[in-house]
């Protein structure tokens, strides 16, 4: 039992086969609602709201140099508790610096290779913010966060704090500020980079060098940089991406220290790199962030590319990697409903469609043993009381049903049943030309269109970064599909070859293993594939875009070449129909013969129909079938449901 001014104990622990949220020793399905206190009051006028785990953006309360004002934070918390006395709340805190601080420390403010950053464009977070390399900012923001957590710890509402969602960068999502304008050229960055190089190269330190935009767009062979003469660039990219990890590590440590380890820490991080913009926006040190003992959970909005009814709207992270390290993934389900006023990203026109896309988000989280919060941007950002996105009884009834299903799921085995591992690489970006060069047409194809084909393949899959694929907690799979692993360390290459030699079915795309830490090697790629791959000046991808260089396998018939248990698709995407053949060759069970988005895990199967007509689901073992939304029994002791 906690006292009124003591933080509850909120943890992520193993439970029935997967990481789970625990509150004061009890497993809880992590279904949250992100809305404003006033909007929550409005929802209660329609029907009771079954979701009592809440989140919203709260102020850091850092008002000036050495000054803090907690009144706004206190008032916001009290308003939520008036709206829902049972609420447990996770404040989202942006570690922004006040203008006064930046005025006093101009050398600590982000600089940009592209001067257009200062044009007034705020769509990527705006230009004037502290550099993530700034030691002064990290120290001052850490102190501000420490003062805030101490204040909350001594408040009457401490027992209602679920955890702390820590953010910085664009929308608090740990994307570097104004990333499309190529940060960071500030004196703070240059000084920190010099110190880092001195530690890495203690005998002969190279001079710190910041690449120009033209140098970022350059390459040695088509899209590829030759590691032999690009070490300076690779070092810069690696250091740049470490900064967000380092800053988050300091802030998460503050929370754990000041809460005596009782509060959950969550951060946006580890997104699929699916925006097709320059890579400064990505989280390419996620393998290190994932291993931070002070961060319990990670989150992302799900994909914005396929959200219409019938689309898959996939979660936008590497859930396999997160699960392997014992952490918990959250999906930010910011689906626009039919009553939402903004038109951007809005794909539904009726309340029935609205409810179905919300259930689609829930099914993704349920079958992946993840959490989610439904994000009511209308209730957050508009004072007009007619603008809440969830102000309809059908939606509140759906939330209540989801809460019931989620609670029931915590009593069941929470294991994944996937026989396919899909593997990607964050490090390969350091060896590629910037996307704005026009030289890289293939990586976005692999992250967006190719993943869509996997969703349509009739078999569930788990997605990993290669940095976690060989963790001891990762289960064996029948098929391993390597999306963009053009760069492989010698150790990674040896482990992938061991999978091949053990008889696992492997599927590769474009240029697997073509890059090592020291060189470009076609022979290395041939040895991995066991094929006489030939390099050409260029190739045309199925979408009509030209990619340099190209690769072919002489004598191969069609889009995919085969050598025993190894399959190779040089020009992605590989269509779902052909992909099904590869998976079947690897002995993978097919649950669905149609191209509908499929979600399977934890004893649940979800389908979000992409087309009209009859659907047949095939389970590998006999089972009793029920509609969890209605409770209706559909079939007993059967392997098939129509």
Where are these regions (language model features)?
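Hydrophobic faces of well-ordered beta-strands that scaffold small-molecule active sites
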Residues: 31-33, 53-56, 89-93, 162-166, ...
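Aromatic-lined substrate-binding rim segments of carbohydrate-active enzymes
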Residues: 40-121, 140, 149-153, 248-259, ...
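Aromatic-lined carbohydrate-binding/catalytic grooves of carbohydrate-active enzymes
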Residues: 48-75, 98, 271-286, 293-297, ...
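Carbohydrate-binding surfaces of carbohydrate-active enzymes
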Residues: 4, 249, 257, 261-262, ...
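Acidic (Asp/Glu)-rich catalytic clusters
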Residues: 42-50, 76-85, 156, 287-293, ...
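Short, acidic/polar
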Residues: 35-47, 277-291, 354-362, 469
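N-terminal carbohydrate-binding accessory modules
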Residues: 1-46, 409-411
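Polysaccharide-binding and catalytic clefts of secreted carbohydrate-active enzymes
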Residues: 103-295, 301-304, 312, 318
